[in-house]
Every structure is written in structure tokens, then in C-alpha cells.
């Protein structure tokens, strides 16, 4: 068996990636979220495939096909809710995974980090298009509002929006192409995940101390495979409780009303995992400025390795940077809350303040604090 594992062309790759992989001996539970993201992606692809067997991407039947899945298909309701809440679990793990990368300085592995940013954008695009498919009120108006942002691009904006829509408004052509892209993107994400892992295994994993762990490695299996299994149990338990006891907790009641272009919902908002970016978009009164801020709220991650001024890689021994990191986390939670509130005072001013603080923290405060810590340590 050992010989097959180490000599067979395919088994050899799996062995070097998941069994005999040398891993740092001190990585904490924050490193569990990578494997949990792999599990989430698998769950989403499997449940999505079964949903696609019964879903019809036509404006006249999309809403009723989702109702048909829930009422008439064997266990259709649970497949639908695992898929919907699985997306929430996916983003929850994704945000923690990125946060861990920021805290422990994993962004210094440039190739891995940049592929990770591409993965984030691809997953966000997939989730957005998936939200449009049930063709409820929030699906229709969310698609209209977000795609309409492209019209802010000078010269080509209007033509670009109509090209994305496939007409002069969000309609049948839009729904059909969104379904096609929503189906293919998870497989592109899976391919990017493989590239992400290839780059990670080129350099080896980071660890909480941020220093080289070449002198102290242990095999991935059984140590970290068992450790990851604990995370899997927690994730599946949380997802099961959410699906079986409160499946609509994170959804919007407006999406149980069929899409109607003549009636605008009182408050258009995306799913909770986009609310921080939506709050940044709304905080700027100018349309083009808002779109640029929205794009930068994600793309700013690509600048972080170049803004890293500290002599130490990890924040483990940098208390001032730790404080700033948790200020950033609190700020993102504030933005998420604001994104779900109506556009009125005091929410407008809170959103604007939090948006300024978000960019200020990443672009100015964190690099300056790192330089100050270098001075304190006489480096």
C-alpha cells in the first residue's frame, strides 16, 4: 500500500498534498478554514447540480420552479436550503480565512495571496448571480441596481449595461446568462483552488509566529487531517442547525414575492456577506466615486503586501497592530450593519465615517503603526 501511495502517478500527487505533506507543528485552529472552504465548495457544487436538474432559467417559470423544488421534489427543500445557507457558511469561512492571512502575515506569499483575491472575486460573482436565479423581488431589483453600476463607467457605461442585460432591462436574456455563468463559475473556482494549493505547497504554509518552520515539521496526516475533521464536524453541525431550524434567518422575505418590475421594494439590499461593500458604495454621493470605492474595498487586498512595513511578518508579537486589526474587524461589522439599514440619518453619517476609517486603517494607520513598532524595537 505504501509503495502505491508513493509511486503511483496520481496517488503520489495526493500523497504529497494531503498525507506526507510537511506542515508546521504550531499552526492553530485558524488554519482549519482552508479545508472548510474546500468542503463548502464541494457542498455547493453537489447541491447546485441537483437544483439545476429541476430549475428553469425563464422569467415566466423560474420562481415557480424554485417553489416546485421545495414542494414536489424529494428532499428538494433541504437541498435548496443547504445551498442557500451553504453560501453564507462559505463567506463566513472566507472572511475568517482572509482575516487570518492579514493577522499572521500570510500575504507575503504573493502568488498564493493574489490567486486568493481572484478566488474571492470569482466567489462573489458566483454568489451574486445565484441570488438572482430565484427571480423574487430582491433578486430582480438587486440585479437591476448592481448591474446598473456599470453605467457609471465613462463613454462605454450605457452600452456595457445593455450588453450585460441582453436588452434594455433585466429580463429573460439576463436570467438565462446569469444561470449559465452561475453554473460554470464554481468549476473555475475549483480550478483556481488547485492553483492556490500548488502555489502554497511551493513555499510551504505560514504559521502563527511568522518565522520559518523548516526545522520543525510534522506530517499532515494524521495530525492535521484529524484536526480538520473537528472543524468539519462544527461546520456541518452549524449548517444543519441553520437549515433545519431557521432556514430563512439570513434571507430576505421580499424574495418570496415574484419579481415585479412595476413595484420597487422599500429597501433594496444584497445578502449579508455583501453588505460591507454595499455600505461603502452608498456612502459616496457620486455614482462613479461609489463604484470605484466598491471596487477598491476588495482590490485593496492586493496592495496589502506592498504596504507591509513591519520587520516582523506576523502580528503575534505586535500589540499595537493587533489593536488596529480588531478596529478594522469592528469597522467591517459596523459597515455590514449599516448596509442593511435604510438611507437616512444617523445611518448615512455612520456609514461615511466607517468607510473613511476602513481605507484610512489599511492605507495609512497600519503601515505607520508598523514603522512605529520597528522604532520601539530599535530595528
From Swiss-Prot:
Belongs to the cytochrome b family. It comes from Nycticebus coucang. PROSITE patterns: CYTB_CTER, CYTB_NTER. Pfam families: Cytochrom_B_C, Cytochrome_B. Its cofactor is heme b. The keyword Transport applies. The cytochrome bc1 complex contains 11 subunits: 3 respiratory subunits (MT-CYB, CYC1 and UQCRFS1), 2 core proteins (UQCRC1 and UQCRC2) and 6 low-molecular weight proteins (UQCRH/QCR6, UQCRB/QCR7, UQCRQ/QCR8, UQCR10/QCR9, UQCR11/QCR10 and a cleavage product of UQCRFS1). This cytochrome bc1 complex then forms a dimer. SUPFAM superfamilies: a domain/subunit of cytochrome bc1 complex (Ubiquinol-cytochrome c reductase), Transmembrane di-heme cytochromes. Heme b b566 binds at residues 97, 196. The chain crosses the membrane at residues 33-53, 77-98, 113-133, 178-198, 226-246, 288-308, 320-340, 347-367. GO terms for molecular function: metal ion binding; ubiquinol-cytochrome-c reductase activity. It is found in: Mitochondrion inner membrane. Heme 1 (or BL or b562) is low-potential and absorbs at about 562 nm, and heme 2 (or BH or b566) is high-potential and absorbs at about 566 nm. It is a multi-pass membrane protein. Heme b b562 binds at residues 83, 182. The keyword Ligase does not apply. GO terms for biological process: mitochondrial electron transport, ubiquinol to cytochrome c. Binds 2 heme b groups non-covalently. InterPro entries: Cyt_b/b6_C, Cyt_b/b6_C_sf, Cyt_b/b6_N, Cytb/b6-like_sf, Cytochrome_b, Cytochrome_b_C_euk/bac, Cytochrome_b_N_euk/bac, Di-haem_cyt_TM. This is Cytochrome b. GO terms for cellular component: mitochondrial inner membrane; respiratory chain complex III. The gene is MT-CYB. Keywords: Electron transport, Heme, Iron, Membrane, Metal-binding, Mitochondrion, Mitochondrion inner membrane, Respiratory chain, Transmembrane, Transmembrane helix, Transport, Ubiquinone. It comes from the Eukaryota. A ubiquinone binds at residue 201. Component of the ubiquinol-cytochrome c reductase complex (complex III or cytochrome b-c1 complex) that is part of the mitochondrial respiratory chain. The b-c1 complex mediates electron transfer from ubiquinol to cytochrome c. Contributes to the generation of a proton gradient across the mitochondrial membrane that is then used for ATP synthesis.
Amino acid at each position: 500500500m505504501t509503495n502505491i501511495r508513493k509511486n503511483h502517478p496520481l496517488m503520489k500527487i495526493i500523497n504529497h498534498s494531503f498525507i506526507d505533506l510537511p506542515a508546521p507543528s504550531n499552526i492553530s485552529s485558524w488554519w482549519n478554514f482552508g479545508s472548510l472552504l474546500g468542503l463548502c465548495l464541494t457542498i455547493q457544487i453537489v447541491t447546485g447540480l441537483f437544483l439545476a436538474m429541476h430549475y428553469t432559467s425563464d422569467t415566466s417559470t423560474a420562481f415557480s420552479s424554485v417553489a416546485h423544488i421545495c414542494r414536489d421534489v424529494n428532499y428538494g427543500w433541504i437541498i435548496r436550503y443547504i445551498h442557500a445557507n451553504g453560501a453564507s457558511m462559505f463567506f463566513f469561512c472566507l472572511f475568517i480565512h482572509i482575516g487570518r492571512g492579514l493577522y499572521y502575515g500570510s500575504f507575503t506569499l504573493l502568488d498564493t495571496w493574489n490567486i486568493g483575491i481572484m478566488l474571492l472575486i470569482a466567489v462573489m460573482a458566483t454568489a451574486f448571480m445565484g441570488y438572482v436565479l430565484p427571480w423574487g423581488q430582491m433578486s430582480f431589483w438587486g440585479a437591476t441596481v448592481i448591474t446598473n453600476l456599470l453605467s457609471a463607467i465613462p463613454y462605454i457605461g450605457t452600452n456595457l449595461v445593455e450588453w450585460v442585460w441582453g436588452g434594455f432591462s433585466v429580463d429573460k436574456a439576463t436570467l438565462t446568462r446569469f444561470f449559465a455563468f452561475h453554473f460554470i463559475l464554481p468549476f473555475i473556482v475549483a480550478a483556481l483552488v488547485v492553483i492556490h494549493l500548488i502555489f502554497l505547497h511551493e513555499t510551504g504554509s505560514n504559521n502563527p509566529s511568522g518565522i520559518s518552520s523548516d526545522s520543525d515539521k510534522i506530517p499532515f496526516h494524521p495530525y492535521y487531517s484529524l484536526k480538520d475533521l473537528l472543524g468539519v464536524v462544527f461546520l456541518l453541525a452549524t449548517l444543519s442547525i441553520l437549515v433545519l431550524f431557521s432556514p430563512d434567518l439570513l434571507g430576505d422575505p421580499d424574495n418570496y414575492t415574484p419579481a415585479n418590475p412595476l413595484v420597487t421594494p422599500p429597501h433594496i439590499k444584497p445578502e449579508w456577506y455583501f453588505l460591507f461593500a454595499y455600505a461603502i458604495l452608498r456612502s459616496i454621493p457620486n455614482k462613479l466615486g461609489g463604484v470605484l470605492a466598491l471596487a477598491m474595498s476588495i482590490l485593496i487586498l492586493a496592495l496589502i503586501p506592498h504596504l507591509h512595513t513591519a520587520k516582523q511578518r506576523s502580528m503575534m508579537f505586535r500589540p499595537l497592530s493587533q489593536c488596529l486589526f480588531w478596529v478594522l474587524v469592528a469597522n467591517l461589522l459596523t459597515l455590514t450593519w449599516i448596509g442593511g439599514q435604510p438611507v437616512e440619518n444617523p445611518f448615512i453619517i455612520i456609514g461615511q465615517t466607517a468607510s473613511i476609517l476602513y481605507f484610512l486603517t489599511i492605507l495609512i494607520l497600519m503601515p505607520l503603526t508598523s514603522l512605529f513598532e520597528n522604532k520601539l524595537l530599535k530595528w
